Amino acid sequence: WGFTFKSNCQDVEVRNLTFSKYPEDACAAEDSKYFWLHNCVFNIGENKYDVTEEQDKGEGDGATDMNGNSNVTIAYCRYNQTHKTSLNGGSDSVKSYNYTYHHNFFNGCKSRLPLTRQVNLHMYNNYYLNCGTCIDARASALVLSENQYFEGSSNCYKVTASSSEGNPAIKAVGDILTSSKYTK
């Protein structure tokens, strides 16, 4: 089933776990701080009884959803064919601070690598192989992407601005795109 750390969890470390066939979120945290997730494997989820309004959780919901947190690091993890991989900051108004993703491998993932809303995010040295929408910035998210490697990915960067949600931005430095695309 996976698990969620809720409200005021602090100094959490999750490591060396493998998540498969989860119907909802595999590993999530809400309103917590100092969260370190590393050396984990996230395989495709499975929900045979998706009765939600969204009707898109047949492959599970988020592998790693982090909402309203501060000081989150996700490192040395492997994501295999996950659908909604990682949502950071799920609100239009609640600011989340200081998220870092480094040395992760995204293999054949569909979207949210991660999707960020109201987040300051630093990403470096991640590898994306045959993925869909990768870094997706919305609602005042600020992303620094350094030395990422994208291979065979269809949309490496996506920025969605809205007058009601604020302007997001992605700054990419040293990223390499091989047989990959991005939307301006």
Predicted regions, residues:
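N-terminal carbohydrate-binding/catalytic regions of secreted carbohydrate-active enzymes
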Residues: W1-A28, Y182-T183
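Right-handed parallel beta-helix
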Residues: Q10-K21, K33-E53, G62-A63, G68-G90, ...
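Helix-rich interaction surfaces within compact, conserved domain-sized segments
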Residues: A26-E30, F35, Y157, S162
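A short beta-strand motif that forms part of the nucleic acid-binding face
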Residues: A139
